[in-house]
């Protein structure tokens, strides 16, 4: 079973494409030594940690126009 589940993540983000984009951008920030906002992440990979942050509502999604 994957954590966090896609169902939980889709409740936080209205589009799976936006979810992928946000997770990738956040993973890139984490790779560049940005501080992690959750304690004791389940995943050891940056993308997994980014998804955990999204699931925990630690990432605020802002629409750019």
Curated annotation (Swiss-Prot):
Q: Name one GO molecular function term.
A: DNA binding
Q: In the UniProt record, which is one GO cellular component term?
A: DNA-directed RNA polymerase complex
What SMART domains does the entry give?
A: RNA_pol_Rpb6
Q: What InterPro entries does the record tag this protein with? A: DNA-dir_RNA_pol_omega, Pol_omega/Rpo6/RPB6, RPB6/omega-like_sf
Its BP terms in the Gene Ontology are: DNA-templated transcription
One Pfam family, please name it: RNA_pol_Rpb6
Which N-terminal stretch is annotated as signal sequence? none
EC class, as a word, reads: transferase
- Which reaction equation describes what this protein catalyses? RNA(n) + a ribonucleoside 5'-triphosphate = RNA(n+1) + diphosphate
Give the EC number(s) listed in the UniProt record: 2.7.7.6
Record's keyword terms, sorted? DNA-directed RNA polymerase, Nucleotidyltransferase, Transcription, Transferase
SUPFAM superfamilies membership = RPB6/omega subunit-like
Gene3D superfamilies per record:
3.90.940.10
Q: Which family does it belong to?
A: Belongs to the RNA polymerase subunit omega family.
**Summary of the function given for this chain in its UniProt record:** Promotes RNA polymerase assembly. Latches the N- and C-terminal regions of the beta' subunit thereby facilitating its interaction with the beta and alpha subunits.
Its quaternary organisation is: The RNAP catalytic core consists of 2 alpha, 1 beta, 1 beta' and 1 omega subunit. When a sigma factor is associated with the core the holoenzyme is formed, which can initiate transcription.
**Any idea what this protein is called?**
DNA-directed RNA polymerase subunit omega
Organism expressing this protein natively: Geobacillus sp. (strain WCH70)
Q: Gene encoding this polypeptide?
A: rpoZ
